[in-house]
Amino acid sequence: MARITVEDCLKQIPNRFELALAATYRARQLVQGHTPKVDAKDKPTVTALREIASGQVGIEMLKKVPS
């Protein structure tokens, strides 16, 4: 199992506060039923961080308000 680290995510979103918000918004979307963009074997929070680290989800999450 590959481990996800904050450093991997900070390469995509350098501001750790924006990173936390983007991961939170994306995790909420995943809980609500949105399709994951990476292999989703983990909890929604880990999946959201994996998406950010891979560059498939980024700062644009802050412009979208979760419903």
From Swiss-Prot:
Assembly mode:
The RNAP catalytic core consists of 2 alpha, 1 beta, 1 beta' and 1 omega subunit. When a sigma factor is associated with the core the holoenzyme is formed, which can initiate transcription.
Tell me which PANTHER family the record gives.
DNA-DIRECTED RNA POLYMERASE SUBUNIT OMEGA
- Functional summary from the UniProt entry: Promotes RNA polymerase assembly. Latches the N- and C-terminal regions of the beta' subunit thereby facilitating its interaction with the beta and alpha subunits.
Lineage at the top is: Bacteria, Pseudomonadati, Pseudomonadota, Betaproteobacteria, Burkholderiales
Single biological process term from Gene Ontology: DNA-templated transcription
Source domain of life is Bacteria
Supply the alphabetized keyword list.
Answer: DNA-directed RNA polymerase, Nucleotidyltransferase, Transcription, Transferase
- Family annotation (HAMAP family): RNApol_bact_RpoZ (MF_00366)
Which chemical reaction does it catalyze?
A: RNA(n) + a ribonucleoside 5'-triphosphate = RNA(n+1) + diphosphate
Task: Report whether Cell inner membrane shows up as a keyword of the record.
Answer: no
Q: Which InterPro entries match?
A: DNA-dir_RNA_pol_omega, Pol_omega/Rpo6/RPB6, RPB6/omega-like_sf
Which SUPFAM superfamilies does the record cross-reference, listed alphabetically? Answer: RPB6/omega subunit-like
The protein's name: DNA-directed RNA polymerase subunit omega
**Organism in which the protein naturally occurs:** Ralstonia pickettii (strain 12J)
Q: What is its EC number?
A: 2.7.7.6
Q: Which gene encodes it?
A: rpoZ
Single GO MF annotation: DNA-directed RNA polymerase activity
Secreted keyword on record: no
Give the UniProt entry's GO cellular component terms.
DNA-directed RNA polymerase complex
